[in-house]
């Protein structure tokens, strides 16, 4: 094996991403070296491509980006005993410290010292990736590569959707991006009564409808208050999944929640915004922030879901070779694509 590989690198502190030759990652005794088969482009990768304020203060340059992947074990350190060369794997993109209070209590997703693959340390947009063995997740034979490549965002959706009991509940999802659509489909799979998704992007709403989300609402043309009676809803939504990061959507959600409703918040807002906290108080709402995936319960649950009733393959709208990476980033930056999967 050559000690050099091709990789997509954030090589300059300016918009863009570049294909370069970089050294193959070195592994320590507890690391696994993964030969990448497929990767997917995340919204985080778009932020890094655009070099927005968040990226400028977060990502050191140069950096191999990317954190949505599937591949096979190519090598491993002397202390690794659970994996074998050629085994299909994906992996958790949040590297946690293992020694803080939350890590020691089994709550690794709450680690204060988390490092992000492809953000704070070299990522998956390369021919090889090195991660700690603790972060490696074996992929069952009946899960296709392209589905395993999008487990990171699917995990975000599963973590958000399963934060509260959904059986028999009316669920509002604000934001029909890929993760929002995934969250709506998960809610339907686990027994929600009514599932409504809102957005103002007609392409994304059309994709949500095509994939089988029960009720699709264009918030620029319809008011939720007008839609609810048509669905037989008399009191409000029981559970909200906020996936948009958009102030108007979050305010609509608060307005239409039932008293005692529960909201899981994954969408990241570009800037701070106000909400009416009196409504939160007098409705006695429960708000829960979501970041990443629970380690590793979310992984177990989403693998079980895709082995069963959950089909998210229709969310992949672009399948391209890695040499056409610019086409993939252009599609993601347009805001009108589903998931983009790149073949290495």
UniProtKB/Swiss-Prot annotation:
Which Gene Ontology cellular component terms are annotated?
cytoplasm
Give the record's subunit note: Homotetramer.
| Binding residues annotated for Zn(2+) 2, in chain numbering | 97, 100, 103, 111
* Biological process terms in GO annotation: L-threonine catabolic process to glycine
Give the note describing cofactor binding and stoichiometry.
Binds 2 Zn(2+) ions per subunit.
Keywords on record: Cytoplasm, Metal-binding, NAD, Oxidoreductase, Zinc
Per the Swiss-Prot or TrEMBL record, the active site comprises 44, 47
Q: Which family does the record assign?
A: Belongs to the zinc-containing alcohol dehydrogenase family.
Q: What is its EC number?
A: 1.1.1.103
Question: Which of this chain's residues are annotated to bind NAD(+)?
Answer: 179, 199, 204, 266-268, 290-291
Tell where it localizes.
Cytoplasm
The record's Pfam families line, in alphabetical order, gives:
ADH_N, ADH_zinc_N
What's the main place this protein lives? cytoplasm
Marked site (Important for catalytic activity for the proton relay mechanism but does not participate directly in the coordination of zinc atom) residue numbers: 152
Catalytic activity from the UniProt record: L-threonine + NAD(+) = (2S)-2-amino-3-oxobutanoate + NADH + H(+)
> What cofactor does this protein call for?
Zn(2+)
- Taxonomy, superkingdom: Bacteria
Name this polypeptide is given: L-threonine 3-dehydrogenase
Q: Which residues bind Zn(2+) 1?
A: 42, 67-68
Alphabetized SUPFAM superfamilies for the sequence: GroES-like, NAD(P)-binding Rossmann-fold domains
Q: What does this protein do?
A: Catalyzes the NAD(+)-dependent oxidation of L-threonine to 2-amino-3-ketobutyrate.
Q: Which gene encodes it?
A: tdh
Q: In which pathway does it act?
A: Amino-acid degradation; L-threonine degradation via oxydo-reductase pathway; glycine from L-threonine: step 1/2
Q: Name one GO molecular function term.
A: zinc ion binding
Q: Which Gene3D superfamilies match?
A: Medium-chain alcohol dehydrogenases, catalytic domain, NAD(P)-binding Rossmann-like Domain
């Amino acid at each position: 094996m050559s000690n050099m590989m091709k990789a997509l690198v954030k090589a300059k502190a300016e918009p863009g991403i570049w294909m370069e030759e970089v050294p193959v990652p070195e592994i320590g005794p507890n690391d696994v070296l993964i030969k990448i088969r497929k990767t997917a482009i995340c919204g985080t990768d778009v932020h890094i491509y655009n070099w927005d304020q968040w990226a400028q203060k977060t990502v050191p340059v140069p950096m191999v980006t990317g954190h949505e992947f599937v591949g096979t074990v190519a090598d491993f350190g002397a202390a690794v005993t659970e994996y074998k060369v050629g085994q299909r794997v994906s992996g958790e993109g949040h590297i946690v410290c293992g020694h803080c209070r939350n890590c020691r209590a089994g709550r690794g997703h709450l680690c204060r010292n988390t490092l992000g693959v492809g953000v704070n340390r070299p990522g998956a947009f390369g021919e090889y990736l090195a991660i700690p063995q603790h972060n490696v997740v074996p992929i069952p034979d009946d899960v296709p590569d392209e589905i395993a490549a999008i487990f990171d965002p699917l995990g975000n959706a599963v973590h958000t959707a399963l934060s509260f009991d959904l059986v028999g509940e009316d669920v509002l999802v604000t934001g029909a991006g890929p993760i929002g659509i995934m969250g709506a489909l998960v809610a339907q799979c686990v027994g929600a009564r009514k599932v409504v998704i809102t957005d103002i992007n007609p392409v994304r709403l059309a994709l949500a409808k095509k994939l089988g989300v029960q009720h699709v609402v264009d918030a620029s043309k319809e008011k939720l208050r007008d839609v609810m009676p048509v669905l037989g809803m008399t009191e409000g939504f029981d559970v909200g999944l906020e996936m948009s990061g958009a102030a108007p959507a979050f305010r609509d959600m608060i307005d239409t929640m039932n008293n005692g409703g529960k909201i899981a918040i994954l969408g990241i807002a570009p800037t701070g915004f106000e909400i009416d906290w009196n409504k939160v108080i007098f409705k006695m709402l429960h708000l829960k922030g979501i970041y990443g995936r629970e380690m590793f319960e979310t992984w177990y649950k989403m693998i079980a879901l895709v082995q069963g009733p959950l089909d998210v393959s229709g969310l992949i709208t672009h399948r391209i070779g890695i040499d056409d990476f610019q086409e993939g980033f252009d599609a993601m930056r347009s805001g009108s694509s589903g998931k983009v999967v790149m073949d290495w």
